[in-house]
Structure formats: structure tokens, C-alpha cells
């Protein structure tokens, strides 16, 4: 996902944004690589256009393995597939951070079981830890199924599974709200070794 940062300004009034790569799960992988020097990879899907290639370049700069990027043919306008955008205002003083997601019809939201070769990742390549969370699962009706598929294969190969509840009302609103988030999270919980959350999740 491409994150657009207006600096100290507001989304509604700024005239420029700085761009970063981002995403709840990706940020963990980047932190492990940049802060601790650990090998980390991201599994995601991007529309194959200039914005997708920008995200790829930013991931490269972050030092995260991108060999599991799934490229989806772009239709030229974004009717069928797009790359996710997240506009994020910084919080400081009494002003809370604020975000505006633009993530409908994204390549990652269209992932479905069978699209990713999890056996290769956890079997042949020997990945030892899998991390995902509520943001990915909120993107569509199929993303929780992809998370479950990955967890089942990871568990079979003895990898540790972590899950960040990371509840975002704006992402869950169109597919059932908090009740849907609770149902999805409870369904995945038995497969999780490390669950991360707080009283807001």
C-alpha cells in the first residue's frame, strides 16, 4: 500500500504529500529488517502500473524480500484492480492522528485461497514466522480465507503464527462492522500462537 503523508498539514488542505510504503503487516516486516537485521519478506498483491512499481521500489529500499509479490494486470483506469492508498495525518499536541483509506478494488483485497503458494514459503523456503492481522482480514470477504489458508500451512510446518487484531472501524464498516470483525477473529484465534491487541480491539 502507498501511504501519503501531508507532513504537519491536514489531508483536506495540503498541496503536497510525501510517499511511503506501508501496511500493518508490512510495517512489522520492515521493522524486523531495518531495526534488528532479520530476514523478512512480504506477501502481497499489486496492480502492475507505475504506482505498484513505486510501492515495489519503496519495499526494496526498506530491505524487505519482495519475491512473493503477486502482480495483477492493470486495466488502465482502475475499474477492476487498483493499488491501495492510505492518507495519514500525524498526531501531535491535542490533535489525534487521522487517516483516510482508499482501498476498494485493490489487488490485495482480491486475493483468494490458492493464489499464494504457502507450501513453498513454509515448506521449501522454511519461513519460521507468519504475521498477519485484522487490517488484512478487513479488506474483503476472501482475505480472512487467505489468512486461514496461510495459518494452516504455517502450523503444519511448525512456524509461529502472530495476529494483530488492529481493529479499524472504517475498514470493517462495509462488510459487517464490529460483529464481523469479532466473528473473523474468533474463527482464526485457535490457529494463532501470539495475539496482539488492546481494549480498543
Regions found by a protein language model. Give the residues of each.
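Positively charged, low-complexity intrinsically disordered leader regions
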Residues: 1-11
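Short pre-catalytic strand/loop immediately N-terminal to key active-site residues, enriched for Gly-Thr
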Residues: 12-22
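Alpha-helix C-terminal capping segments
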Residues: 20, 27-41, 61
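Short secondary-structure boundary/capping elements
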Residues: 20-27, 113, 180
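Short beta-strand segments at enzyme active-site cores
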Residues: 37, 41-44, 161-165
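Conserved N-terminal subdomain of the carbohydrate kinase-like
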Residues: 39-134
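Conserved beta-alpha-beta core of the PfkB/ribokinase-like small-molecule kinase fold
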Residues: 129-201
